[in-house]
């Protein structure tokens, strides 16, 4: 089964907790703090594997969670960093954040990697908090939570050239005679419902990858017919091979077919019209095909080259294949997404800055604190130790939480809630 769009959940591993410990050794009277830092949580990394062709595996496994880092140890021993979780995807996979719609990565070549969910850093042990004023702190941090998100994976097949046209114009037949591909061929519309790829070898020894894409009908850019399922795959092709049925046996005018298909391509993505397009006049072995081709040429205002062929009798194929190959070699790749990052190994985009906290009122009158930054501080605080609680209180005051609560009307003794933690507001 060909699967080209799935939704998955990914979560980076949490960092390991820092440790509170002290040196207690003979002949070391002033041992001092000796709690180690926690290890870094593993990241979820998507990596391109050229041996994969579909997203089929993701139909059965939709959750990917990296391991958390080890906790810090006594004697200032750092906890072990967790291994990254590598998730293999086929070339041509685009990763999109479901909530924001942001493209996180566009993975096209073998071995390319992108960090999709970054692991949290390890919490600091009490050694890191020692100061001249407090040389023996009973204070440490919990590990930072790893990033978690739902992402949409879209597969857009990687092909040098793509066959487009109305259903039943002979695209699958053409692919089957110029390559070893065996697409399903029948005399009804939408026989092809998934892309088929074939390697085409030209008579001079050169070769290219040709994609037979599902037939297109009017309104496809709005999702009619196979809609976006088809149009998505043509975005990566360098050359568009437009197949037209010159026999007109189905009652459609060949020129009207040509105009309709190009209107759909233009409506879906204007950049598709930048690609070179070759017109294939197919079924020239049928009656009236030659007359229809002459009328087509009279109406055609574009300068796209026309290649009369018969996929069934194989007439005219080699000139067409050589022209496709020549066009591919002189046409650069068209980037789908503009990337500003230059790092070749990984791609990780930081989220836009958000307010550190938001204050709202619950039905019971409590003031509710929320926000990514304040919730991260909460999760990294060890509330089993008084010194950690006092530090958390100072952090809230430094962020301006106390003053913001006063401006919202909070009074002495009012209830304030942050995640599962509740405390009283004190002036």
Swiss-Prot record:
Keyword line: Cytoplasm, GTP-binding, Hydrolase, Magnesium, Metal-binding, Nucleotide-binding
Binding site for GTP: 165-172, 190-194, 212-215, 282-285, 310-312
Domain Obg intervals: 1-158
InterPro entries for this protein: G_OBG, GTP-bd, GTP-bd_Obg/CgtA, GTP-bd_prot_GTP1/OBG_C_sf, GTP1-OBG_CS, GTP1_OBG_dom, GTP1_OBG_dom_sf, OBG_GTPase
Region (Disordered): 118-144
Chain positions recorded as Mg(2+) binding sites: 172, 192
GO biological process: ribosome biogenesis
SUPFAM superfamilies to which the protein is assigned, alphabetical: Obg GTP-binding protein C-terminal domain, Obg GTP-binding protein N-terminal domain, P-loop containing nucleoside triphosphate hydrolases
Residue stretches making up the OCT domain: 349-427
Named cofactor requirement(s): Mg(2+)
CDD domains: Obg (cd01898)
GO MF entries: GTP binding; GTPase activity; magnesium ion binding
Domain of life of the organism encoding this protein: Bacteria
Subcellular location, record wording: Cytoplasm
A cellular component annotation (GO) from this entry: cytoplasm
EC number annotated for this UniProt entry: 3.6.5.-
Sequence ranges assigned to domain OBG-type G in this UniProt record: 159-329
Coiled-coil portions: none
Oligomeric form and interacting partners: Monomer.
Function: An essential GTPase which binds GTP, GDP and possibly (p)ppGpp with moderate affinity, with high nucleotide exchange rates and a fairly low GTP hydrolysis rate. Plays a role in control of the cell cycle, stress response, ribosome biogenesis and in those bacteria that undergo differentiation, in morphogenesis control.
Family statement drawn from the similarity comment of this UniProt entry: Belongs to the TRAFAC class OBG-HflX-like GTPase superfamily. OBG GTPase family.
Protein name, entry field: GTPase Obg
Species for this entry: Halalkalibacterium halodurans (strain ATCC BAA-125 / DSM 18197 / FERM 7344 / JCM 9153 / C-125)
């Amino acid at each position: 089964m060909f699967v080209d769009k799935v939704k998955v959940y990914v979560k980076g591993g949490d960092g390991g907790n820092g440790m509170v410990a002290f040196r207690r050794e003979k002949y070391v009277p002033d041992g001092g703090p000796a709690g180690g830092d926690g290890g870094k949580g593993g990241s979820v990394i998507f990596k391109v594997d050229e041996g994969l062709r579909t997203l089929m595996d993701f139909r059965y496994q939709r959750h990917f969670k990296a391991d958390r880092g080890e906790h810090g140890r006594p004697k200032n021993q750092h906890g072990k960093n967790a291994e990254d979780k590598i998730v293999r995807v086929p070339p041509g996979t685009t990763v999109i954040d479901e909530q924001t719609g942001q493209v996180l990565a566009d993975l096209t070549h073998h071995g390319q990697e992108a960090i999709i969910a970054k692991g949290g850093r390890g919490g600091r042990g009490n050694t890191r908090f020692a100061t001249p004023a407090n040389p023996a702190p009973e204070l440490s941090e919990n590990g930072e939570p790893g990033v978690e998100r739902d992402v949409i994976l879209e597969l857009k097949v990687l092909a040098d050239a793509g066959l487009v046209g109305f259903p039943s114009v002979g695209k699958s037949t053409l692919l089957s005679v110029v390559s070893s591909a065996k697409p399903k061929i029948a005399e009804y519309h939408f026989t092809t419902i998934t892309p088929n790829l074939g390697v085409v070898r030209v008579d001079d020894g050169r070769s290219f990858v040709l994609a037979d894409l599902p037939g297109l009908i009017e309104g496809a850019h709005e999702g009619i017919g196979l809609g976006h399922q088809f149009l998505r795959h043509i975005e990566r092709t360098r050359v568009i091979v437009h197949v037209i049925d010159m026999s007109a046996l189905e009652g459609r005018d060949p020129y009207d077919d040509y105009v309709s298909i190009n209107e759909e391509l233009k409506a879906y993505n204007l950049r598709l019209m930048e690609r070179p397009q070759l017109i294939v006049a197919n079924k020239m072995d049928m009656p009236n095909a030659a007359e229809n081709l002459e009328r087509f040429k009279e109406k055609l205002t574009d300068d796209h080259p026309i290649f009369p062929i018969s996929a069934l009798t194989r007439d005219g194929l080699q000139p067409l294949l050589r022209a496709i190959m020549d066009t591919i070699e002189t046409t650069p790749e068209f980037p789908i997404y503009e990337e500003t990052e230059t790092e070749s190994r990984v791609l990780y985009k930081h989220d836009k800055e958000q307010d550190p906290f938001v204050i709202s009122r619950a039905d019971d009158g409590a003031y509710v604190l929320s926000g990514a930054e304040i919730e991260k501080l909460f999760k990294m605080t060890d509330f089993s130790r008084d010194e950690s609680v006092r530090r958390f209180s100072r952090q809230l005051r430094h962020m301006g939480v106390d003053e913001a609560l006063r401006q919202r009307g909070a009074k002495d003794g009012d209830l304030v809630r942050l995640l599962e933690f509740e405390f009283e507001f004190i002036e």
